[in-house]
């Protein structure tokens, strides 16, 4: 079970089930700004003060390495991708369905759901056009009828979209998510290992990191892995297992910051603890296996994460 945290205090109210509690947020009640997590086989208990571990408890974990995902964690990238797609549709006057009076424009509400339904840029467009009709455009005056022409349409749109996305990232208008830079600097100052592990292509991640966290911080990472560096992508745990090996740190002493259930699954399968900073497109996902859930990292300090990791107690 995960603790869901927002900018207001963490509050506790009795639930209808004996021996359990529910978490509530309200400025009108007494808040608990710090908590520890005891994880048992049957249930989880949250407490403000330290609670003695069961005799059978395994050794406490120690935060030795902090690992960040990139898209969704360091930057909220999905809306930027949506903007780049819509700019491509406008540039090539993509009409879908062909009878439409205006170029295609994916709304924020639609894209939040769509990007969790179909992964990858080209598969997204292919799926959408198959469902809604292959479009007219300045690339093809009439809807493409054969596989080669359809592939050319999608390739052209994707290539233009990719370059547009790079322009947006380089524009200086994109900011990292709240608290990310401060938390990275805290970890480095405390002598913790720092890594970024992303399922995206290496060139895309490098572009984002150099422009958002700056080149000096990027070069100061103890480990950087992208989707190109492992055979299987998340939710396969390979990228996190490889990171632990390169960092020289036990998986149990690593803490991962993710934004989606796919990333959470990759971290937990690797044997690592994970906290979630959700986005608008992932907020409804099931994060029960995370040790904490936040809307962002603005109020999260390194000592908070150390306390979380140190007080995870698993019944033997």
From Swiss-Prot:
Gene Ontology terms: cellular component: chloroplast; chloroplast envelope; chloroplast stroma; plasma membrane
Transit peptide, from-to: 1-46
Signal sequence annotation: none
GO function terms (MF aspect): hydrolase activity; metal ion binding
Protein EC: 3.1.3.-
CC cofactor: Mg(2+)
Magnesium keyword on record: yes
Protein name, UniProt field: Haloacid dehalogenase-like hydrolase domain-containing protein At4g39970
């Amino acid at each position: 079970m995960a603790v869901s945290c927002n900018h207001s205090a963490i509050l506790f109210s009795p639930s209808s089930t004996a021996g359990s509690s529910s978490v509530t947020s309200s400025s009108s009640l007494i808040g608990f700004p710090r908590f520890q997590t005891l994880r048992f086989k049957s249930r989880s208990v949250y407490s403000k003060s330290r609670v003695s571990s069961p005799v059978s408890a395994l050794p406490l974990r120690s935060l030795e390495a902090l690992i960040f995902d990139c898209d969704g964690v360091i930057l909220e990238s999905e809306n930027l991708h949506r903007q780049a797609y819509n700019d491509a549709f406008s540039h090539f006057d993509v009409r879908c369905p062909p009878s439409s009076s205006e170029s295609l424009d994916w709304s924020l509400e639609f894209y939040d759901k769509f990007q969790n339904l179909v992964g990858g840029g080209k598969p997204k467009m292919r799926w959408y056009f198959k469902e809604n009709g292959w479009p007219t455009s300045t690339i093809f005056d009439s809807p493409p009828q054969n596989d080669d022409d359809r592939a050319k349409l999608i390739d052209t749109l994707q290539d233009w979209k990719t370059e547009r996305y790079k322009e947006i990232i380089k524009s200086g208008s994109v900011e990292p998510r709240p608290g990310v830079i401060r938390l990275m600097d805290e970890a480095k100052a405390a002598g913790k290992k720092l890594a970024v592990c992303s399922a995206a292509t290496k060139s895309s991640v490098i572009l984002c990191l150099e422009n958002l966290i700056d080149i000096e911080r990027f070069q100061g990472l103890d480990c950087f892995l992208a989707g190109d560096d492992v055979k299987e992508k998340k939710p396969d745990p390979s990228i996190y297992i490889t990171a632990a090996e390169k960092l020289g740190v036990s998986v149990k002493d690593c803490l991962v910051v993710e934004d989606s259930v796919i990333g959470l699954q990759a971290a937990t399968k690797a044997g690592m603890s994970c906290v979630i900073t959700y986005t608008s497109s992932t907020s409804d996902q099931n994060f029960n296996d995370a040790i904490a859930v936040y809307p962002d990292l603005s109020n999260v300090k390194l000592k908070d994460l150390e306390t979380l990791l140190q007080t995870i107690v698993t019944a033997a």
